[in-house]
């Protein structure tokens, strides 16, 4: 499929003889690994056999729908599924390196929140800090742009000028409504595109209380990295080496996917846990590492209390995992759970979470609280002085969580 899309990007839908051999020249692979020589070939007379001019091919404008991703079956996940690595960043770079005056492409929007295989921090920094985008139309739900096509994280098309530096005319398409503003894609230097203009307003109010909290002092510090207890196949999402009954040897509770075990847990020996043993005796919280669609009104899977002498499979993340900096009481854990279930918390997560997956980085815009007490939405709205319009906006998007 990627080859077909690449061919269409170069030639469009014209009914003409197509004289550049895309597959044999390995354009897709070379777009990521051999750009300098590839660009020389694309500009050469020999590549475009219909070009009778003796001069080098020049690109005034590059327009297209590049291939989005390529599955790499040689790289398996713990669930034995293939990784899908993003291709479109290489084609954006390729277009820019042709010295074209203007570039207009349609691509997934996952890069805006640094999500996905093949999306590097260096590349996102270059896109955001260059400020070369003149216009961008961004769809949170790809079906509003392409009927019956699901693209996690949404889709966008843009006008990019390599020698332009300035604000972007950014249009967000959401639930049939369009909002256009002139702005830099990262006006507060958070490292991501905050795609909701109301979110900028709310973040600014949180910043008035917490400072530049999103660059360090935020809920990310509470959440474990993926693969916290598991290693390889051991304690992976599909691992079934646990006992259904507790006994003298199998006395560590293992929380697993409920599709694997109806009760949601089994029992293992401490020696079955390959790493992170210091967290086992702690009070903690578990939350599914995947939850929601990225555009739904719940945002996250339901968190639950993790008692001492418990661990989890790859299905879950651990909140309060660090014995030195966390070490919460049971009461504090339940207060954290209440905070997670608040609409305010889940709205702040939704600013960055645009796919089903929720790695720890999606909690970047969630401020920390004093967890010696429970928090309600009313208290949180008051703490950050959210006005009635902002409160109603959050509650129009986020449903209550039981």
Show which residues each predicted segment covers.
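SAM-dependent methyltransferase catalytic region
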Residues: 1-136, 141-145, 158, 163-170
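Short loop/turn and capping residues at structural boundaries
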Residues: 11, 392-395
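C-terminal substrate-recognition regions of SAM-dependent nucleic acid methyltransferases
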Residues: 142-315, 319-391
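Short, amphipathic C-terminal "tail helix"
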Residues: 394-402
């Amino acid at each position: 499929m990627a080859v077909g899309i690449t061919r269409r990007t170069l030639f469009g839908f014209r009914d003409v003889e197509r004289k550049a051999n895309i597959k044999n020249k390995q354009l897709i692979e070379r777009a990521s690994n051999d750009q300098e020589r590839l660009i020389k070939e694309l500009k050469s007379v020999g590549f475009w056999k219909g070009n009778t001019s003796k001069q080098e091919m020049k690109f005034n404008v590059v327009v297209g729908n590049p291939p989005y991703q390529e599955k790499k079956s040689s790289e398996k996940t713990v669930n034995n599924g293939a990784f899908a690595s993003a291709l479109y960043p290489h084609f954006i770079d390729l277009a820019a390196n042709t010295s074209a005056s203007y570039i207009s492409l349609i691509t997934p929007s996952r890069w805006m929140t640094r999500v996905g295989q093949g999306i590097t921090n260096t590349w996102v920094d270059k896109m955001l800090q260059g400020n070369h985008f003149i216009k961008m139309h961004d769809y949170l739900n790809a079906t509003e742009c392409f009927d019956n096509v699901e693209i996690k994280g949404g889709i966008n098309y843009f006008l990019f000028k390599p020698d332009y530096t300035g604000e972007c005319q950014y249009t967000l398409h959401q639930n049939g409504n369009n909002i256009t503003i002139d702005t830099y894609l990262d006006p507060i230097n958070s490292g991501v595109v905050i795609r909701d203009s109301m979110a900028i307003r709310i973040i600014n109010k949180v910043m008035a209380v917490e400072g530049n909290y999103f660059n360090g002092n935020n809920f990310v510090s509470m959440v474990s990295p993926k693969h916290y207890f598991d290693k390889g196949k051991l304690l992976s999402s599909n691992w079934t080496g646990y006992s259904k009954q507790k006994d003298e040897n199998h006395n560590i509770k293992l929380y697993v996917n409920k599709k694997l075990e109806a009760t949601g847990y089994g029992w293992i020996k401490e020696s079955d846990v390959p790493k992170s043993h210091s967290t086992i005796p702690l009070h903690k919280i578990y939350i599914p590492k995947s939850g929601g669609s990225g555009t739904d009104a719940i945002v996250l899977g339901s968190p639950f209390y993790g008692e001492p002498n418990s661990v989890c499979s790859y299905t879950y993340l651990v909140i309060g995992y660090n014995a030195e900096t966390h070490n919460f009481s049971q009461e504090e854990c339940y207060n954290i759970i209440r905070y997670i279930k608040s609409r305010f918390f889940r709205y702040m997560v939704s600013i960055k979470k645009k796919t089903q997956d929720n790695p720890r980085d999606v909690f970047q815009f969630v401020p920390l609280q004093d967890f010696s007490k429970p928090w309600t939405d009313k208290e949180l709205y008051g703490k950050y002085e959210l006005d009635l319009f902002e409160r109603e906006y959050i509650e129009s998007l986020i449903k209550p969580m039981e």
